[in-house]
Amino acid sequence: MKMRSIFVIAILAATTAAVLFHGSVVDVQQSHHTERISGTGGDVLEEDPVGKLKVYVYDLPAKYNTKPVEKDPRCLTHMFATEIFVHRSLLSSAVRTLDPEEADWFYAPVYTTCDLTASGHPMPFDSPRMMRSAIRLIAERWPYWNRSEGVDHFFVTPHDFGACFHFQEEKAMARGILPVLRRATLVQTFGQRNHVCLKDGSITIPPYAPPWKMEAQLLPPATPRSIFVYFRGLFYDAGNDPEGGYYARGA
Ligand SMILES: *[C@@H]1O[C@H](CO)[C@@H](O)[C@H](O)[C@H]1NC(C)=O
């Protein structure tokens, strides 16, 4: 539940430009008795978006979202499960509107990372086709996409290099962001600045971690800690890239 609300806050915060997650730096400074955080750890959203922001959630055919999860429930606990939980939380969110005419923002639930191999690795090779197909449908059935080619639309694209949809950096960069998504807002875990797979205005979010795993790590607040916060950084894929090239980067 907690993780879900964090993601919703991240999404809502973007519309008010109140939160800039990507590139945030947290410096942990040690002193004799206490640890202090300085730097820009991300601004806090102070305004309550309820009543000010309305999000319309497209009702897409199940093949774009719930069907793949039924087929492979491992998608629910995978690090890319954000695409599922953002969708679920928006469905019952106070910012949701059922009337697209009054919407400020449109969300299309397309789960592009739920095609897992036997060993649980997501295969993004079908993602571009799936995304293009969903957008074609949205553009045909509703008038809102064509007004601005999706400027007021957002998508969750949590795969390694976001909407570049490839797990190897060179190939992801050569592909670039899927053209049909270039005007929309992308919510993604990939957050490296000045990278072709991160466009301006994207929202960087943490990968999904199942609540029971998070809860298992909870420490009593008074516990002395030498590490205050830890961000997972580079990923290496020794199997596919024995030379040690980058596989993907954490947010
Ligand atoms: C939006 O544009 C596409 C491509 O030109 C077209 O096929 C579609 O019918 C348009 N949608 C609407 C609702 O007019």
Residue spans of the language-model regions?
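Nucleotide-sugar donor-binding catalytic core of glycosyltransferases
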Residues: 2-251
